[in-house]
Structures are given as structure tokens and as C-alpha cells.
Amino acid sequence: MSTPTPKVGFVSLGCPKALVDSERILTQLRMEGYEVVPTYEDADVVVVNTCGFIDSAKAESLEVIGEAIAENGKVIVTGCMGVEEHTIRDVHPSVLAVTGPQQYEQVVTAVHEVVPPKTEHNPLVDLVPPQGVKLTPRHYAYLKISEGCNHSCSFCIIPSMRGKLVSRPVGDVLSEAERLVKAGVKELLVISQDTSAYGVDLKYKTDFWNGQPVKTRMKELCEALSSMGVWVRLHYVYPYPNVDDVIPLMAAGKLLPYLDIPFQHASPKVLKAMKRPAFEDKTLARIKQWREICPELTIRSTFIVGFPGETEEDFQYLLDWLTEAQLDRVGCFQYSPVEGAPANELGLEPVPDEVKQDRWERFMAHQQAISAARLQLKVGKEIEVLIDEVDEQGAVGRSWADAPEIDGNVFVDSDELKPGDKVRVRITDADEYDLWAELV
């Protein structure tokens, strides 16, 4: 008589990099015959992959762990907040195991201890696709090229959670990308903590892919990915000089003309306190040069307002810089002290919460006007759109300017499309974030 198939519940919190970690754990569990179920009550054990980047993320992680314990009782915790095991166990002493990020084998071992895998052959194993388990829609996937970061930004604790930069061999990355494309993926989203630094730790070592030598470096990786005939989108690009090397690839249509490049601030004084590159004038000149080479370039960035020591003059400098930069997509966060971050020891004057809120609102209104004006320029133009979903009201897609989850959408007036379709459309309307279009 066969034993019941062991069942695992899984909750993945945080950024796309954590999502890739979840995919890796789930792939291993599926390979061992575990069934992944969508509810707490149907699971033999629940794994929660946490986020620990800022206090609100930690609070959400603790809340979800509590829900899983209440609904199921058997909970294993992993991910970035796992480095603070004492905090987790203080709030939830009944968790069965706590592991940090990237500790895939420890998670799987902890699952084994609660509910062992079946010893006889499980037909579920035969259903695991060659590209592994993916938590994204079939037509796009995140491609993680490295782990960790060599920077010491004073507001950030990622190096203490995920360690120094460790780049994946470029041959492994390209082989994974190839499997994804063969499985029907039409957009590869390249992610890491620092995409620009890819290969630095390996001294840009030459690896091999399909018998051909390829250097472990961002430009060469992008050139190889561009040969696969799918959209390739770069995320988390630190503003190193070598970013200039990939702009011509975008202009030539080999990469999506899209840069996700976190500038964080513009005031030289604030950037210095953040331990970020403080060359804001040169950055403006580079942005201008990038757009001269690739006029279609979309630039997304993130900023922090209310960093300790930020004055009204610093903030106004940032707004003026935004006016000059004319960025397309921008996210903004109010500074929140993070336990263990070097910024806590700088001795700078904290910005009051009400001032942070006021600056955030002014920042968002200022940038919203810029984004709306830039989107308005697209009305009447024809663009290619990748469809994400379709319902009775029409299709929802994205252009080269729109990454999933964080950017806007293109609403297409058609119910004849399906997710994964690439279509030409004409833009008919725009607001601050989204576009409306008709099929060409």
C-alpha cells in the first residue's frame, strides 16, 4: 500500500530575488515528490520565505508566520529575516526551524524531518519541468545572476544578510536562460543585488556556453542573452561606468531599452552620508548621453527622502535634479531606520516623521507630473506589447518601458488575445502611470 503524498504549503515574501530562492526550494521539493498545496489546512508543513530589509517587511513576515502557525501549526522559516532567529523565536517560539537566505538544503532537510519524502516512485516527480518550478506567469521569468553585494551603503543591511558578491558562472546562467526560453518564456528579467558588478569577484573569468568562450561580465552576458530572441530586461543596475557599455546594445535592439538604476538621492551631502556615488552632475551628463545613443531608453529609479541630516535645501536640490533628469519611472521611500544599518551610527539629526511624509508627498507629486508628461509623448505611436492577462474588459500588457509588478500597464481594447502574446498596438491615451491602446 502506497504512502500518502507529502504536502507542503509555501509563502514567498519580499523581492524578486527572494522569489527565485523560493522557486529553487520548491523545485527541489517537487523533485523529491512533495506536492505544493495552496492552503495552510491542506499542508503537512508550511515554509515561509521572509523579507527582512526594512521594519515594515519584518512586521509583515512575523504576521504571516503567526497566521501559518495558527492555521497549520508546523512552520519552517527561511529567507532574509532568518538571520534574526532570536527575533523570530521571541515572537513565535513554536517555529520548527529557522534558516537564512540561500540555505536551500537546510530548508529541504527541515521539511524532511517533519514529513519525509515518499520512498517509492512518485509520478509527481515526472511532472517537474526542466526549467524547474516557476512562480511567475509562463511567459516571463526572473534570471538571478549573482548573490550578495560588495557595497556598504549606510542605509542597507543586505551584505550582512546575503553576504559579499558571489557571481554565478556565466555558462550556468546562460544554460538556465536557454531552458526557460525553450519552455516558452518570452521575457527574461535579469536580477541580482548589483547587476553591474557581475563577475567582479571572479575577475571576469572566461567560462563556456555551447562550446563558445564567454566572459563572466555584464556586457558579455547581455550579448549572449540577446541571441535568444526574447525580451531581456536589466534590473538593479548600480551606476558604474560600465553601464555605458550596454546602452549601444539597447540602441541596436539587442536588449530592452530599460534601465532599473537606483540613484537614491541627488544631494552630494546626502549621497556621501549614504555612502553612494556623489557625482550627480556627471550622472545627469551620462543620462543625457545614454538618451542620445538610445532615444527610446526608459530609466526607472528609486529614491529615499528623509535620510538623517537631510535638510530642506538638500530636498529641493533633489527636486531640481529630478526636473533635469526627466526620469520615466520612479519609486520613493521614506527613510526608516533598520536595525544593524551603519546609518544608525552616523550621529546625524533624524528627520521628523511629519517632515518625511511632507517631502514624500511633494516628491511624488513632482515626479508624477514628469512621468505623465513623458507618457503623453507616446500617444499616437505604435509599440510592441507583451500581454500579461485578459478578461472581459480587454487585455492588460506591458511595453519595453514596463517591468512587471513595479511599473505601469498598457490596456489593450481586445478580448481576442491571450497571456504571452506579443502584439503591435497604437497608443490612444495616457495618464501618470498607464497607457491605453488599440491593436494595429
From Swiss-Prot:
Recorded catalytic activity of this chain's protein: L-aspartate(89)-[ribosomal protein uS12]-hydrogen + (sulfur carrier)-SH + AH2 + 2 S-adenosyl-L-methionine = 3-methylsulfanyl-L-aspartate(89)-[ribosomal protein uS12]-hydrogen + (sulfur carrier)-H + 5'-deoxyadenosine + L-methionine + A + S-adenosyl-L-homocysteine + 2 H(+)
Protein name: Ribosomal protein uS12 methylthiotransferase RimO
Keywords for this protein: 4Fe-4S, Cytoplasm, Iron, Iron-sulfur, Metal-binding, S-adenosyl-L-methionine, Transferase
Residue stretches making up the MTTase N-terminal domain: 6-116
One Pfam family per UniProt: Radical_SAM
CDD domains reported for this sequence: Radical_SAM
Cofactor note: Binds 2 [4Fe-4S] clusters. One cluster is coordinated with 3 cysteines and an exchangeable S-adenosyl-L-methionine.
The UniProt record lists the keyword Oxidoreductase: no
Lineage top rank: taxon: Bacteria
Enzyme type, top EC level: transferase
Residues that hold [4Fe-4S] cluster 1 according to the record: C15, C51, C80
Species of the source: Pseudomonas aeruginosa (strain UCBPP-PA14)
Matching PROSITE patterns: MTTASE_N (PS51449), MTTASE_RADICAL (PS01278), RADICAL_SAM (PS51918), TRAM (PS50926)
Similarity annotation: Belongs to the methylthiotransferase family. RimO subfamily.
E.C. no: 2.8.4.4
Keyword 4Fe-4S among UniProt keywords: yes
Organism taxonomic ancestry: Bacteria, Pseudomonadati, Pseudomonadota, Gammaproteobacteria, Pseudomonadales
Domain TRAM: 376-440
Gene Ontology biological-process entries: tRNA modification
Purpose: Catalyzes the methylthiolation of an aspartic acid residue of ribosomal protein uS12.
Compartmental location: Cytoplasm
